[in-house]
Amino acid sequence: MYTPNDSMREEISLKVFVNHDWSKLCPDILRSILESLSSTDFHRAKTVCSDWYSNWKTCVKPLCPWRIMYVKDSLMLFKPGEDKIYKGTNVGLSNDSYYMASSGNWLLMVDSHLGFYIFNLLTSKRIDLPSMESSIRGGKVRFEQNHEHGFNWGHFVEPSRKVTVSKITITRESRAVLWIDERTGDFVVAWIFNYRYLFSYKKGDDSWWNWNNHWNMESLNLSFLDLAYRNSKLYIYITKSHIKVVDFSGNDPIEVIDKNPYWEHPFRYLTKKGEYINKRRIAIQKSGDVLIILSVLAQRSKEKVLFYIFKMNLASKIWERVESIGDDEMLIFGHGVTIRAPVQDVGDGIKSGSICFVSDVWPPYYSPAATNWGVFDLATSIIKWSKKDSFNNRYVQTYLFFPGFA
């Protein structure tokens, strides 16, 4: 049956035929084409040329997160819109790989040999990082792999001790960040293990860096808690609520000392009666400002789950609670940077001023919903939970991935 959509397609086809140049399509026509594409093709389209990329940035399309899930230790990928479940092995990921972080269309993964690699979900391109068994710069630590199949992957070995590395310690006691420039291919990876070790790698380095001895963390009784990366700087949140900053813009990473306003002014928050802070994370806005985000369980008249966001007033050097993060920015809890978002809700509650999260932000005993991810509106403190499906329940370990954005 002939429909108005058929007429529109014919009109578009005619204009394209007359134009003969896909890069010079009328912006309105190009935008309508881009917004009609599947999630995967939508993000591939921005790489066609600079004109397409410029138009792509103006599109209003729902930010539907893909879900990376582990079902009985098998890696699965769910693409919204297509309503399909893919096995990790079908897209190029092995079952013994574990998600660590994401950036753009890329995932940072680690396997059971503690082998790190970054993987583009749209192109299946894979970049292997140097082996952790090779020489590590900056600290007296090395990794010894367990070559027998078993629970333990190996050990980090120092002169006075050995620390076990296993699936549990990697998935539960590690934090990681990935940044990649999709056009130049430059990238930076950093990760925390066991709150004790911080490693980093920048494209072009001949080995990993270890920062433990550089800062003498253990003698100062300090631990690494979280990290974020933006604008060539790595921000590290440590115990006692201090924040260190490392500049990666040069050949070698250098700690920023004089121009780091956060070190001498640690974050402080006194909980109110009935408040329980479960997790603390940092994130960097596009302006470069640092945010500290708390996931809070408030036990007052009835239990309520909340998020609090704090930002330093750079004039007074006082951390202040904020109710907004900008007109076109939103957060994925634990991701480390804000991402571009539509001002109005275009689906699932995801819009500017919202926080997308998975349910492990709350204590293990507290299960506020049957599903495993939701969206928190900062303005109203209301949570919109995702729709329940066969894989969307609190017993499935889930990570959220926004291709092209985070």
From Swiss-Prot:
CDD domains, sorted: F-box_SF (cd09917)
Domain F-box: 20-67
Pfam families: Beta-prop_KIB1-4, F-box
PANTHER family: F-BOX ONLY PROTEIN (DUF295)-RELATED, OS07G0183000 PROTEIN-RELATED
Official protein name in the record: Putative F-box protein At5g38270
